[in-house]
Amino acid sequence: LAKFILGNAIRDKAAQSPVARRVLWGLDLVFVGLLLGVFRVLPVAWASALGARLGRVFGRILKRRNRHVRANLSLALPDRSPAEIDALAGDVWANAGAVLAEYPNLYRIADPRREHLEIEIVERIPAYDAPDRPVVFVAAHMANWEIPAAAIARLGFRPRLMYAPLANPWLDRLILYYRA
């Protein structure tokens, strides 16, 4: 997430003023907290679909950020047409929205009594025979990057994760709460 969500236009002033920074952090916390609260009361599939829809909308509204996403996609995929890049940018924003909407539902997604998470082991994992021994799992960020840790835990391993904390420490604590 950005340093500020709602106050990005005045981030330079906020960088100079601890009071302004805290006010913007608080506004961001309230905004994201309300969104996550709505997503938490919805069924998982609905929350994810709504998050994807909102992600697409916000992607169009956040023009400067969308230009940045499009520029990165153009660099990574130089053979794609501008129309294809636009479509991919929309997909990037939809995925980001879906991931955000799934945060307050991670406990339901990971719950083995529900059918949200299917684990399929294609080849034998030698470390599976000794889950108390250290092993490194690597997962691609194809959709919700929090789900592989839940799958690993369901296999009997105790995952330890690395992440970069958010610039807003209050928002960071909220996201960590949902990750736990």
Describe these PLM feature segments.
Residues 2-139, 172-178:
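Membrane-anchoring hydrophobic helices of lipid-metabolizing enzymes
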Residues 98, 131-180:
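Catalytic core of membrane glycerolipid acyltransferases/transacylases, capturing the structured
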